[in-house]
Amino acid sequence: MTQKVHNASYAAFALFAIGILPAFSQGTIANSYIQHNLVSDIAGMADFTDSHLVNPWGISESASSPFWISNQGSATATVYNGSGVASATVASVPNGATKQSLTGPTGQVQNSSTGFLLSNGKAASFIFATQDGTISAWNGGTAAGIMVDNSPAGAVYTGLALNAAGPTLYAANFHSGKIDVFDTNFHATTASGGFTDPNLPSGYAPYNIWNLGGKLYVTYALQNSNKNQPVSAAGNGLVDVFDTNGNLLQRLVSNGPLNAPWGVAIAPAGFGAFGGALLVGNFADGTINAFNLTTGSSLGALQTQTGTPIVIPGLWALVFGNGKSGGDPNTLYFTAGIQGQLHGLLGSIAPPAAVTSLSNGASAGAATAIAPGEVVLVNGGTIGPSPSVSGTIPTSGSMATTLSTTTVTFNGTPAPILFASASQTGVVVPYEIAGSSTASVVVSYRGQTAAAFSIPVAASAPGLFTSAETGSGEVVAFNQDGSLNSTSNPAARGSVAVLFATGDGMEDPSGQDGVVNNYIIRAPVLPVSATIGGQTAQVLFAGSAPGLLAGVLQVEVVVPTAASTGAQPVVLTIGSASSSQQSATIVLK
């Protein structure tokens, strides 16, 4: 029975110990941000080099997809995850029938509706606008297909938005000074409100349009004499807010620090000093300014850690990640046509790395103290990559202490890393902290080092692993026959059940950081007891789980015959500390 349990438990632990990723992040309050370059067509300028990324404008993504980027300079669309790793997908975006002096894709949208069908009878996945007046769409293959060609009329499409509820497509026509509207069949239509601002100054035209939270934010820039380029000067910019029928809701921002504004995003609460603000990026001077989302009052420009404004020449799109393949939701991603739009840059902007709390890796509860060898979750912001990266449990040797440039130390000793992500990193507390009253936790990522986070050290801090990876619900337990305990597979009263926990503290022989438990069985130096359904459960064995990483405790108990049937609470006590998971249960029959 024991060997069956050991084999099955390895698969279970791989699912929850490496995969525990509940979201948590909290920004700092200072106006201090760090720019990181992810991809460029110039070698050495960013983490990755891609020759297609020339003057990238628009960014779009679905709820879980990577970033899709419109490269005006190479007439392509390319795909990258939140860390800048490129997909093999490269789609060309064609020119119109009447090729103008300005070509290539600008704005783009991801289509989540069932409309906008292409020739293959399937809905478009991504839709692109171009400076030479076309709208193209893609749902597979190596090239987008032209669905609208207004190049003969001289249209200059510099931005694109979509209302999936219509579905309706909106294109900013910088040349005509209008918002062109298209129905689900790519046919020209009109919006009842007409996107009219009676107080729009002469010479201003829509430079971009964004759908943010169901409202359409239109940025305006001053046209040059040819009505195809913006005039650069401080104050040359406006932001209006419309509903999806083109009715003006408000003039949100007038002039001020705006200078050919194009990128617009609403910052989440976790984005430091400007959480909840409207962020507007200026193409002309490369700054990003924050405004009150309701009143439009200026809140200032995003600054570096030295207090100077962040300046990104040729700045285009601004977008926050989707929390999946498309980056961290508390990190701002941008595109830029650097060096006079002859080259390109995709990058990120985030608050400095910060640790805000620790949690027990099994119970997921906030840790008031940690124990040597405990699996813990380090919570914070900008402390790892997005999307997350999982470590590998070694068959021999030790678990790595650096993962995707993330390191975590406890009183200077590197911790084995289970996974790393932007808002949470899973580690095993080094046994070397034993004897210390407190631990200084320091996270480093991409050369940044977060301020030390101090937490008391306890002799033990037990937590039970649960199937839902939340610290509540059914615990990860195996019945006497080696099968996984569940509602449909309860354990018999009087039988043996096997539980898995962490936080038992020091062991005998001493635990070793990051190693896989082998045939040397290490037992907790503190006494171990358990209750099921409020009844004492005899502990037959408590020690390191063979085949699993040091820090994972296996506890074999006899299910008390006096316990009730159904889901019954389980409490594990090691020394003077008990698991505090009121709703952690095992199912009995």
Question: How would you name each of these model-derived features?
Answer:
Residues 10-23:
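Bacterial N-terminal signal peptides
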Residues 1-13:
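Bacterial N-terminal signal peptides that target proteins for export
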Residues 307-309:
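Amide-donor transfer/coupling interface in amidating biosynthetic enzymes
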Residues 17-20, 199, 338:
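Prokaryotic Sec-type signal peptides and long signal-anchor helices
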Residues 312:
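Glycine-rich phosphate-binding loop at the start of an alpha helix
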